[in-house]
Amino acid sequence: MPACRLCLLAAGLLLGLLLFTPISATGTDAEKPGECPQLEPITDCVLECTLDKDCADNRKCCQAGCSSVCSKPNGPSEGELSGTDTKLSETGTTTQSAGLDHTTKPPGGQVSTKPPAVTREGLGVREKQGTCPSVDIPKLGLCEDQCQVDSQCSGNMKCCRNGCGKMACTTPKF
């Protein structure tokens, strides 16, 4: 009889978690600009966030060992990038300059809603299209950095966080 009560309690807790877990209404889990800093692993597995949108201001959801924590990103913010031109397929051009985004539509054309591949001149960084897939924590596999930026990955692979706080070339979500 006590085992049944324990099962009911566990089922109730799972149901409660499912009911109170926020679901994205838009389906967009946009990643914030910048790169996660190299964080010291946290011995207790803390799940402060799962996506960048869970963090306040410009903070990003970063891996620290088996933990996910909100941290101030490294690298230039979008406002610090200037003179970067990005071509959105054949439907329009976006220019980022002095922190402002300008989109020009060609006559009769529509601007693509997919994120463009951005080249940050002078930094040698090329961000590829798509988003990094979500990672179940902890994830088994190589716990070492295989890349720092998308341009170090072959084909359309992106440099994404793996489950142990390191970066690996991964097939993106579109």
Curated annotation (Swiss-Prot):
A GO-annotated cellular component: extracellular region
Annotated SMART domains: WAP
CDD domains in UniProt: WAP
Domain of life of the organism encoding this protein: Eukaryota
Cellular localisation: Secreted
Signal peptide segment: 1-25
Disulfide bonds: 36-62, 45-66, 49-61, 55-70, 132-160, 143-164, 147-159, 153-169
Chain positions covered by the region annotation Disordered: 68-117
The keyword Secreted is annotated on this UniProt entry: yes
Keyword Hydrolase: no
Molecular-function GO term, any one: serine-type endopeptidase inhibitor activity
Pfam families to which the protein is assigned, alphabetical: WAP
Main location: secreted
Function: Broad range protease inhibitor.
Protein name: WAP four-disulfide core domain protein 2
Annotated organism of origin: Mus musculus (Mouse)
Gene encoding the protein: Wfdc2
